[in-house]
Amino acid sequence: MMQLRHGIFDESSISVIALDTVHEIGRLAGRSLDARRFRPNVVVRSLRSAPFQEDQWLGGVLSFGEADDAPAVTVTMRDIRCSMLNLDPDSATPAPEVMKAVVRANQNNAGIYGVVTRIGRLAVGQIVLLRAANEKRERG
C-alpha cells in the first residue's frame, strides 16, 4: 500500500468490499458475480458472515496483519455505487439487475472507502483486523 497525492480513483484512495456482500448482491440479482465487477482494491473474506458488514466499519481502522507497524486504512465512507457495476468485467455485457439489487438492499452502497494511514505491503491471505480509530493496539 502506498499513499498518493494524486491518482486514479473514485472517491478515496482505497476501496474494500467483503465477499459476503458480493455474494448477497449476486443472490439478489439472480446471478453469480465476480468481485472484480465492484473494482475494489481489497476483497475481504470475513469470519463474520454478513452481507454489507462494511457499513459497520465506518470510522474504524483496518490493519493488514498483526504487527504493530502493519499497513492500515481508516474507513471514511460507504461506497456509493454507479452503473459501472452493471458491466461484466470480462465481456462488458450489461446486467441492470445488479445495480437494482444494490439499491434495494443497501441504499445503493456496497463496500467502503478508506484512506491509507500506515503504508506497507499487502498479500493475498493476509489477516485483516478491524479496530476502533482510537483503540490502542495491545498484545495479550
Where are these regions (language model features)?
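Metal-cofactor-dependent catalytic cores
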Residues: M1-G140
